[in-house]
């Protein structure tokens, strides 16, 4: 068994040191022995950790790249927009641990993959729906502490504001992975990031952190905001 050093960097999120100088992060396994996307399982003091691959998770990439504000923690209720097959939502569920994570995905085929890989995480609630239409899933999703968005649409920022108005508690947090090329392939990414930030601020957010997630994802920026409403 590999000898590793584990250190908590955020609540329920850890750095793992294999002694090779590489930066790695992990979460405690909510379902020990269960992999979601082929991730490595490691052990320290009889606790199992899932190594979090930043090449497959924009939130993981942001943490590796120096994210300072991490609002997701134990007991945090989360709405995750753009769940895909469940890679990042599974780590978010590990962190939230005792509270619910609503995971929204638009594509039925991908949602089936998500359910197959994450069905043992009892705090992870699959929701099939369109992030542009929060009213359609308002009978399922309760008020949440954090919204995380990873939706590759031209109106990414507007989608976040729309969902915040429906579901985010006052002074709750939102995290959004902005994909510049999904907004406009003709513009400089920095210009797009500035435009998206302006939409978020005008929509009711105070931006408190920004992290570029290259080289893990090209032309992506993670932004963290506090919801002040409007």
UniProtKB/Swiss-Prot annotation:
Q: What does the entry give for GO biological process?
A: box C/D sno(s)RNA 3'-end processing; tRNA processing
Q: What is this protein called?
A: Fibrillarin-like rRNA/tRNA 2'-O-methyltransferase
User: EC number(s) of the enzyme?
Assistant: 2.1.1.-
Organism, per UniProt?
Methanococcus maripaludis (strain C6 / ATCC BAA-1332)
tRNA processing as a keyword of this entry, yes or no, is yes
UniProt function note: Involved in pre-rRNA and tRNA processing. Utilizes the methyl donor S-adenosyl-L-methionine to catalyze the site-specific 2'-hydroxyl methylation of ribose moieties in rRNA and tRNA. Site specificity is provided by a guide RNA that base pairs with the substrate. Methylation occurs at a characteristic distance from the sequence involved in base pairing with the guide RNA.
Q: Which CDD domains did the record assign?
A: AdoMet_MTases (cd02440)
Binding positions for S-adenosyl-L-methionine?
87-88, 105-106, 130-131, 150-153
Instruction: Write down the SUPFAM superfamilies for this protein, in alphabetical order.
Output: S-adenosyl-L-methionine-dependent methyltransferases
Description of how the protein assembles with itself and partners: Interacts with nop5. Component of box C/D small ribonucleoprotein (sRNP) particles that contain rpl7ae, FlpA and nop5, plus a guide RNA.
* InterPro entries (UniProt xref): Fibrillarin, Fibrillarin_CS, SAM-dependent_MTases_sf
Keywords attached to this Swiss-Prot or TrEMBL record, sorted alphabetically, are: Methyltransferase, RNA-binding, rRNA processing, Transferase, tRNA processing
Q: Which family does it belong to?
A: Belongs to the methyltransferase superfamily. Fibrillarin family.
What's an example of a GO molecular-function annotation for this chain?
Answer: histone H2AQ104 methyltransferase activity
